Amino acid sequence: MKKIYVAGGCFWGVQGFLKTIKGIKKTTVGYANSLLENPTYELVKSHVTDAVETVEVIYDENILSLKDIVKKLFAVIDPTARNYQGPDHGRQYRNGFYFVDQEDGVMLRELMLEFSKKYEKPLATEILPLDNYYLAEDYHQDYFDKHPNAVCHIKF
């Protein structure tokens, strides 16, 4: 199993979408690369943490490649949008991939060069090592399982 941290706007929709993909075994939502330890949603949305709403993804690389994950995410978000997706605005909604394996970092940078040729505007996608990840509050976990009619920037 491999692990990657994915951001693409509000983490509710990103998690809901990723859970539909064959090969993804487990997801959680949380806050990545925070300047403060153990940030809360209230702190994140106040912009004092610089954390990004992120989905931790554990996947079977024998079924799904990192490139597949990038391609599928880019099909449902705007990777050229800086600090927003859909109606959600703010740095916590930026898009990116945060890696724990240096080889994944190299691969992601190569993929960004490849995918950038498909867009007129430059990609705003962050590719950074994961400095930290804190689980979001329980009410954020698997949000669309609990609230299937909630509004989302991602259609799935």
Swiss-Prot record:
It comes from the Bacteria. Gene3D superfamilies: Peptide methionine sulphoxide reductase MsrA. It catalyses: L-methionyl-[protein] + [thioredoxin]-disulfide + H2O = L-methionyl-(S)-S-oxide-[protein] + [thioredoxin]-dithiol; [thioredoxin]-disulfide + L-methionine + H2O = L-methionine (S)-S-oxide + [thioredoxin]-dithiol. Keywords: Oxidoreductase. GO terms for cellular component: cytoplasm. Pfam families: PMSR. The keyword Cytoplasm does not apply. The keyword Oxidoreductase applies. The active site is at C10. Belongs to the MsrA Met sulfoxide reductase family. This is Peptide methionine sulfoxide reductase MsrA. It comes from Metamycoplasma arthritidis (strain 158L3-1). The gene is msrA.
